UniProtKB/Swiss-Prot annotation:
Its EC number is 1.17.7.3. Its cofactor is [4Fe-4S] cluster. This is 4-hydroxy-3-methylbut-2-en-1-yl diphosphate synthase (flavodoxin). Belongs to the IspG family. Keywords: 4Fe-4S, Iron, Iron-sulfur, Isoprene biosynthesis, Metal-binding, Oxidoreductase. Converts 2C-methyl-D-erythritol 2,4-cyclodiphosphate (ME-2,4cPP) into 1-hydroxy-2-methyl-2-(E)-butenyl 4-diphosphate. HAMAP family: IspG. It catalyses: (2E)-4-hydroxy-3-methylbut-2-enyl diphosphate + oxidized [flavodoxin] + H2O + 2 H(+) = 2-C-methyl-D-erythritol 2,4-cyclic diphosphate + reduced [flavodoxin].
Length: 613
């Protein structure tokens, strides 16, 4: 893979109805219904809305045999109205259901964590190598008949691994690790290869974007080692709703798409399924602007490890770099200095004029030729002002620098000026490639100056800024290269929206926390309560609790697992019933839905008496 130049990974083509995936085909977009699969009319109408919005596949939860059989009626209902969209059956826990679904759906998704292995109990199991091999044989014996049914019916499959539903067997041998998630997938892929079954799509998802990106990168490397080129389905599970869901999805999915990985995506929002499609389309279209871009002559630094990156070693300059959290620099060249206390930038770039009224606790950056050394202000130079920078005595200096301006003279200057923070700029179609190339050159030269990534936008819609900036910054954060971000928007959006987006990106990348985090699933036919209203009520009561993580899950398929690092959880337990969790431990079961939100808040109050609820 080329870190600096965009090329899509070459994958095998998979036939899914009349909409093939992988190979030379475009990146496909899909969603999943949240209606009961036994309600044919509701499923048909929702599937139509997904297709009308631009969805190319529709997935439906398939809990049992009767739901699997009803896929035929849903298919008939759609086709009778001219909707030829392929249907995907989503199967957990019961391989018999997958056998039936394969006769009626164009694709069947199975979960290796619960296909043959027992449901996860979070207990550590001990296996000898012989016993472990016997468990693999059990998978083979059950999986091969399913593959034969798929061959007979020309049905594709997705092997869909979820971080939240790894089996106890995998957890016991590999732990809760990317390696375990990859091996969970590879056990099934090796059987597919041995059985000459190639209509396979794979996915490895997590609500933790760091885990998701690292694991997909590792999976691709392992597949390449074993001569496999199956196409990838990308998604961030439990991404949430609103701004959080969009940023989190764009950050994780976008980081992989920008590296050419991914053949279909699903943006999992806790909103109406059809609302996911325009977000996914914007995400894909933005990434594809990189196609056929001018070549970037970057060189990978010897110490960089793409599969397991660590934070780049930098020298701390005041509160930037070293062990400090990534900073946020905000633009206020228009003289408007007001900030949201929850998202107060560390530095404000004021350009050529220092505002008369300044925000307390915020430091200001001025262009170097007008900087006069006033307390709480710092100079910013461009690459043509190196002599001026050498004459300046400030203990913190900023240097705006595009990759192509990184000359031997600039490198020599940085070697004698460790107090300089580089602000990496790019107007290249593949700005990720240029930002990476700049930092890798610094690393190769042994320079430890911190790097802040600057990106210019001209957006009038918050969603557009959220998607584009998260795509641009994602891989830089996951690569461990980011000491700060600077989003500069010349559209009509308020400074508050731009600032919140910057902080949201850092939180989604798990590098800096500025607000409550919600791990909420998009819901499906297994969700038997009003997910969107519940999320809104919980957010209204807890959004001020910075650093708290709350999981809001439709059902137990991924619930306890994906909430493993959440402080508290709210999980559907049946029609009208909710269970509450502290971490992954259930503390109350089968609470009536109408009482559950208040019971959750009451539990948090009693457990965290220092919090104001």
């Amino acid at each position: 893979m080329d870190l600096f130049n965009y090329f899509r990974r070459e994958t095998s083509e998979v036939n899914i109805g009349a909409v093939p995936l992988g190979g030379p085909n475009p990146i496909r977009i899909q969603s999943m219904t949240n209606t009961s699969t036994m309600d044919t009319e509701a499923c048909v109408e929702q599937a139509k809305r997904i297709v009308d919005a631009g969805g190319e596949y529709v997935r439906l939860t398939t809990q049992g045999v009767k739901e699997a059989e009803n896929l035929m009626n849903i298919n008939i209902g759609l086709r009778s109205q001219g909707y030829m969209v392929p249907l995907v059956a989503d199967v957990h826990f019961n391989p018999k259901v997958a056998d039936v679904a394969a006769q009626y759906a164009e694709k069947v998704r199975i979960n290796p964590g619960n296909y043959v292995d027992a449901a996860r109990t979070f207990k550590k199991l001990e296996y000898t190598d012989e016993e472990y091999a016997q468990e693999i044989q059990k998978i083979h014996d059950r999986f091969v008949p399913f593959l034969n049914i798929c061959k007979e019916n020309h049905t594709a499959i997705r092997i869909g691994v979820n971080h939240g539903s790894l089996s106890d067997r995998i957890m016991s041998r590999y732990g809760d690790t990317p390696e375990g998630m990859v091996e969970s997938c590879m056990e099934f892929l090796r059987i597919c290869v041995a059985e000459h079954f190639t209509d396979v799509v794979i996915s490895i998802k997590a609500s933790n974007t760091v885990v998701m990106v690292k694991t997909v990168r590792l999976l691709v490397a392992v597949m390449e080692q074993e001569g496999m080129s199956f196409p990838l389905h990308l998604g961030v599970t439990e991404a949430g709703d609103g701004e959080d869901g969009r940023i989190k999805s764009a950050l994780g999915i976008g980081a992989l798409l920008c590296d050419g990985l991914g053949d279909t995506i699903r943006v999992s929002l806790s909103e109406a399924p059809e609302a996911e499609i325009p977000v996914a389309r914007k995400l894909v279209d933005y990434v594809l602007l990189r196609q056929d871009h001018p070549y970037i002559p970057g060189m990978e630094a010897p110490e960089f490890n793409y599969l397991s990156p660590s934070r780049r070693k930098t020298r701390a300059v005041r509160n930037i770099g070293g062990e400090h959290l990534p900073v946020v620099i905000a633009d206020r060249m228009d003289g408007k200095t007001e900030v949201n206390p929850q998202f107060t930038p560390d530095y404000i770039y004021a350009g050529r004029t220092l505002p008369e009224q300044r925000e307390e606790g915020v430091e200001y950056i001025l262009d170097a030729d007008v900087w006069e050394g006033e307390a709480g202000t710092w100079p910013a130079f461009n690459h043509a002002q190196l002599p001026l920078m050498g004459e300046c005595s400030a203990e913190l200096k900023f240097l705006f620098m595009p990759y192509m301006a990184q000359t031997d003279e600039v490198i020599a200057c940085l070697k004698v000026h460790p107090e300089v923070v580089v602000i990496s700029q790019s107007n290249h179609p593949n700005r990720l490639g240029e930002h990476r190339a700049l930092v890798h050159q610094l690393m190769t030269e042994g320079l430890e100056n911190p790097v802040v990534f600057f990106q210019h936008y001209a957006e009038d819609e918050a969603e557009d800024l959220q998607i584009k900036s998260a795509v641009d910054m994602g891989a830089l954060i996951f690569d461990g290269l980011c000491d700060g971000i600077f989003l500069f928007n010349q559209g009509s959006l308020s400074h508050a929206v731009v600032d919140a987006t910057a902080f949201g990106i850092l939180q989604a990348g798990r590098t800096r926390t500025s607000k409550t985090e919600y791990i909420s699933c998009p819901g499906c036919g297994r969700t038997l309560y009003d997910l969107e209203k519940t999320i809104a009520r919980i957010k209204a009561a807890t959004s001020h609790l910075k650093g708290l993580k709350i999981g809001i899950m439709g059902c137990i398929v991924n619930g306890p697992g994906e909430m493993a690092d959440a402080d508290y959880g709210y999980v559907g337990a049946g029609r009208g019933k909710i269970s509450l969790y502290k971490g992954k431990v259930c503390v109350e079961k089968n609470i009536p839905e109408e009482e559950a939100v208040e019971r959750l808040l009451e539990f948090i109050r009693n457990d965290r008496k220092e919090l104001e609820l």
